């Protein structure tokens, strides 16, 4: 009880301070072919040599389209195409060194959350060269304006193109932590559905559920919410319920692809402003220990945690059930449960598992420790977990596999 009172007091004070900050959204450039506008943006920002950051798959398939645009415009660039899933401190430091050694003056991050997070953290190290990545973990520890930064999402889900966060994994301990600073918000978000056309179905599904988790958790984090973040979270949930499965079934459905990018953008800003919760805190432990893709972890954990919250979230989930057309009548409890059931049904239709059987017994105490340390006191979660309850949720994730 004492800890819970402290957490709520911390959140109340933080909320007062947060409302005094300027919460900038990236400038969106959207629509099919919008990557063609990148050279003009770079020239406007006076970037003469760009640091292009991505992963190996995107580097082979999608990055060449952007590099061709830079070549045609006569803009120099250096590439780093080795970002792994759940990027490490070592990767961040390699990008920073490459940037400085080649006198780059701007970033283009192409891909899902991993390349964007790695590039953000590297950009933070560029402006804070004497500060190790781990020393910038937590809130508002970057404190300096980044070089011009363009984010080009190739998945509709992570929201990294809009957020203040960069999630990095310690190379030695495998602990996953977040840098959170307003300066980490990219200046531009290039939302080109052509960049998501060839996504594997399993990536479309899990990153889409990642976006849904962002929107739902932000919506439930009432303390930090504003009218804008509430509206964007509601819109994102509705758009994901409508467009995710069509995008999953048909990668060439450009309307669905476009709307999913916009939904992910909205959800990204909503959780940037309002926060996330216990779903993310537990999911990050799976990424750190087992390299579980973040969207997959969120997709599996979301309905389990929502059920565990129980009546603390019935009213809000009932409203989402009405907005999405899942259920209009009945009690709040009935509508909330119908909403959770529909999330499970979406997972099932997109062949997402119901749990994880790879979690090892010996790792559960570490998972509990990391999850509670991430969530508290910063996240204004609907239900504050203690060790016993967090462990029980993790065991449900195992049992439901």
Language model: regions and residue ranges:
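ATP/NTP phosphate-donor binding region
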Residues: 2-106
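C-terminal charged capping/lid subdomain of soluble metabolic enzymes
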Residues: 2-9, 317, 327-401
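Glycine/threonine-rich beta-strand-loop-alpha-helix active-site module
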Residues: 90-191
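Short, hydrophobic/aliphatic alpha-helical segments
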Residues: 94-104, 194, 252-286, 368, ...
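Carboxylate- and glycine-rich phosphate/diphosphate-binding segment that chelates Mg2+/Mn2+
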Residues: 165-274
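Flexible, glycine/charged-enriched surface loops at secondary-structure junctions
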Residues: 223-232, 247-259, 274-279, 330-336, ...
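C-terminal catalytic subdomain
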Residues: 274-338, 344
